[in-house]
């Protein structure tokens, strides 16, 4: 697999330790501050909390002229549109990752809170970096 894209996963056997929060913070920093082409793959079935947050944010923006103006100003200031957030089961995440590798500098993966989910161990093995938030 020859690629320049970096794969970074956040994983922990325990729920509620901040995997999703850290994923969003890292992705946002890399994208908006460092100017990297970023994508997030939310593999944390069934909650898909990052995707749910993005959906809720977009619904709120659609209803609020103030938020629309803020989004426009952010785009003007950074030159960056919002990075994509995709969902995938851990068993299909490598296919998703390889599709993104040609268009992204960094892809972040929010993994489920158990390595017992099918595909999680294989996904971890194929990451460039693995962060494990602890409380």
Give a label for each model feature:
Residues 1-135:
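P-loop NTP-binding core
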């Amino acid at each position: 697999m020859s690629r320049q894209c970096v794969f970074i996963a956040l994983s922990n056997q325990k729920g509620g330790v901040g995997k999703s929060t850290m994923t969003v913070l890292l992705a946002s920093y890399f994208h908006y501050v460092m100017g990297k082409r970023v994508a997030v793959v939310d593999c944390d079935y069934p909650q898909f909390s990052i995707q749910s947050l993005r959906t809720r944010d977009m619904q709120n923006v659609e209803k609020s002229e103030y938020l629309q103006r803020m989004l426009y100003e952010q785009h003007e200031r950074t030159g960056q549109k919002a990075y994509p957030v995709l969902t995938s089961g851990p068993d299909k995440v490598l296919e998703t990752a390889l599709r993104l590798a040609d268009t992204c500098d960094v892809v972040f993966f929010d993994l489920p809170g158990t390595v017992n989910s099918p595909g999680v161990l294989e996904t971890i093995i194929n990451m460039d970096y693995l962060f494990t938030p602890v409380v």
